[in-house]
Amino acid sequence: INIGDWSSDVCSSDLVLFTVLGIPFHKWLRWPRTPFICTGLTLAVLSIVMILYGSFVGRTRFEVKEVTYTSPRLPQAFDGYRIVQLSDLHIGSWQGNTPAIRKLVDLVNAQQPDLIVFTGDLVNHRAVELNDFQEILAGLKAGDGVYSILGNHDYGPYFHWKSKQDQDNNLIELKQRQAAMGWKLLNNEHTFLIQGNDSIALIGVENQGEPPFSQHGDLPKAKAGIEGMFKLLLSHNPTHWRREVLPESDIDLMLAGHTHAMQLQLGNYSPSVYIYPEWGGMYLEG
């Protein structure tokens, strides 16, 4: 299986430039020429530049990162099967920038995937965030379709709702919008992917985060009745892997999102590593 996921990275190759640019400011302000002051000024300039770059430039530099997954349990018919994983669009953060999402959809479709999976957090808070993007996202195409799961933001827990009923209605609307886009939402359930005479199970659980994040997932229910098959699990929060999936199930492969690399990635480094043992890329166990 070839799995591609998209990301937008903060570029680290230009950082030296801004270290040099700090020198004239130092002289102009006539600050004491101590290593401590110089280091502090440089770090401050770098932080501001990186934030601005990531916010306005880096986030639209979509990249496809290809990973090849192999397993003796994977049926032969799935050799070369192509999956594109998308996650954490937080579509409300793209208001006024529909061209970027069109660019993303075109990039995904150009991979000619057999399957597209979306691993949660489609919105920040409300389903109406999709108003300008629903038709665009409906353009995602794959041979076996688009499957999705819910992330912690999709339940609307961080918005001040007038009532619990309003929050519940928002979730219903979000599910309806995904269906209208042609996305097949897996809520603690599974389906089968078929190639020739072979098949594998695609399992999706609702958000199953570590506290304080919400826990709606029901893995035993989602995988009931598919013993012995190769199992591909979609679960939003990567900590679910070590908390339940690894010790209590026979899942072969899990795809997750959620971490965002803590909004900062320089090469292969992200501060996420101090919170999430698995924060980006492929990890093998056993």
What is the role of each PLM region?
Residues 21-30, 60-61:
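Membrane-interfacial segments
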Residues 11-22:
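Hydrophobic cores of alpha-helical transmembrane segments in multi-pass inner/ER membrane proteins
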Residues 2, 57-59, 271-274:
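Short Gly/Pro-enriched turn/cap motifs at secondary-structure boundaries
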Residues 58-74:
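Alpha-helical transmembrane signal-anchor/signal-peptide segments
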